[in-house]
Amino acid sequence: MLGNEIKVILLDIEGTTTSIGFVHHILFPYAKQNVEEYLKKEWDSDEIKQIVQDLQQVPSFEVYKATLVDSSASSITVELITGFVRYLIDKDLKVTPLKTLQGLIWANGYESGELKGHVYDDVKEAFEHWNNSGLKLAIYSSGSVAAQKLIFGYSTSGNLLPYLSAHFDTHVGHKQEKDSYINIAKSLETNPEHILFLTDIPGEADAARAAGLQAIILQRFGNAPLTDDEKSLNKIINDFSVLKVDK
């Protein structure tokens, strides 16, 4: 049950609302597979020109070029940038121009119907219940706000964006830092003790509690196992069904 003191529920995405494997097993491979076609189609657009320029400033770009057979080639081609983007994805290097490009490719996939944002079966019902009970819902994820909105706007349970009041990404700070949650509480104009944070990562729950928020750990199927210490220090639930508002 949720006490009357809770005014806002702040949710993580991966491992909380969405399968831990969705981003790595569906979204990343989709971007990797479709990057060349997308670049060919949009190569002359101002947006892609800027991304290509920014990618060339990434330190790994020269490292990547040195691995090529013709490493002295100076022309910037679709093939060169495609190869570098795939290299970054394989190395799991999270650089801003890559994130921006991935977001554009994913948007294309969602809009065409090729992609659906995975959410667990209990998510829509919980969102409805919490909203109907007067609670605000907000998302905090390391994925960009744009990527968050695609997952929930084109989800397997339909468009869930109307249930969500706010979205936060690493622009407010990293997820295992106390100040990030202080910044979120200020942005939401809500006292920290009135915010419940739901996540699958104990370090994030610790940071949220250090900022004065309440926190609960989701132990969904497929999530990383918790240590005995983590189990003893945290309230743990398997899904959202137990989080009913105490009328």
Curated annotation (Swiss-Prot):
Mg(2+) binds at residues 12, 14, 200. It holds the Pfam family Hydrolase. Coiled coil: none annotated. Its EC number is 3.1.3.77. SUPFAM superfamilies: HAD-like. This is Enolase-phosphatase E1. It catalyses: 5-methylsulfanyl-2,3-dioxopentyl phosphate + H2O = 1,2-dihydroxy-5-(methylsulfanyl)pent-1-en-3-one + phosphate. Bifunctional enzyme that catalyzes the enolization of 2,3-diketo-5-methylthiopentyl-1-phosphate (DK-MTP-1-P) into the intermediate 2-hydroxy-3-keto-5-methylthiopentenyl-1-phosphate (HK-MTPenyl-1-P), which is then dephosphorylated to form the acireductone 1,2-dihydroxy-3-keto-5-methylthiopentene (DHK-MTPene). Keywords: Amino-acid biosynthesis, Cytoplasm, Hydrolase, Magnesium, Metal-binding, Methionine biosynthesis, Nucleus. Its cofactor is Mg(2+). Belongs to the HAD-like hydrolase superfamily. MasA/MtnC family. GO terms for biological process: L-methionine salvage from methylthioadenosine. Monomer. Its main location: cytoplasm. It is an enzyme of class 3 (hydrolase). NCBIfam families: enolase-ppase, HAD-SF-IA-v1. GO terms for cellular component: cytoplasm; nucleus. It is found in: Cytoplasm; Nucleus. It comes from the Eukaryota. CDD domains: HAD_EP. Gene3D superfamilies: 1.10.720.60, HAD superfamily/HAD-like. InterPro entries: Enolase-ppase_E1, ENOPH1_eukaryotes, HAD-like_sf, HAD-SF_hydro_IA, HAD_sf.
